[in-house]
């Protein structure tokens, strides 16, 4: 959206998302192979992406306190990911993700040029992306507000109240700098 309609963007809130190729890290080797040559690598991608272990890791990450996480979250996700037709849908969606990676330089250039108010929230137990990614945003937007919370990739699973307070504070302070809530 920032490239298609930059006038619609007043601020950015990012939660465990990547805008730099380096942020994908070593875990993305199988996924990169899939993007480079889909057909011979699709089975390996599906095995990786749709497995119970990978699904669980998206929620728990490297959190040593697994009991804080509701197992229904990853078991429900795993169940729905493994319904008839979902493997094909997920493969197609994931294959398309490569277009995001191709757009990273444009996203970075836009951030460097526009310097939008930027809140980056990162789960310290994130295992899908490289832990250095939050600081990479600061290279593009030096005034970025970065917070590492006690969570994994889906940090809202365990840090919803903290994240809500961070977002509320960001919107409130950014409002004075030009970010206004839209009437709904």
Q: Which residues fall in each region the model found?
A:
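Catalytic active-site module of serine/aspartate enzymes centered on a nucleophile-bearing elbow/loop
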Residues: 143-184
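Flexible "cap/lid" subdomain of the alpha/beta-hydrolase fold that forms the substrate-access gate
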Residues: 2-147
């Amino acid at each position: 959206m920032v490239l298609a309609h930059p006038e619609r963007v007043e601020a950015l809130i990012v939660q465990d998302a990547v805008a730099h190729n380096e942020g994908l890290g070593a875990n993305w080797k199988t996924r990169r192979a899939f993007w480079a040559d889909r057909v011979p690598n699709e089975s390996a991608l599906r095995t990786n992406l749709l497995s119970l272990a990978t699904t669980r890791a998206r929620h728990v990450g490297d959190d040593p306190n697994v009991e804080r996480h509701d197992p229904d979250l990853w078991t429900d996700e795993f169940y729905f990911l493994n319904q008839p037709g979902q493997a094909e849908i997920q493969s197609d969606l994931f294959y398309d993700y490569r277009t995001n990676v191709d757009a990273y330089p444009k996203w970075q250039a836009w951030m460097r040029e526009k310097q939008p108010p930027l809140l980056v929230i990162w789960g310290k137990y994130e295992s899908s992306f490289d832990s250095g990614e939050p600081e990479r945003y600061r290279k593009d937007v030096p005034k970025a507000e970065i917070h590492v919370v006690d969570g994994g990739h889906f940090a809202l699973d365990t840090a919803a109240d903290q994240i809500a307070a961070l977002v509320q504070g960001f919107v409130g302070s950014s409002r004075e700098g030009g970010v206004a809530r839209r009437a709904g």
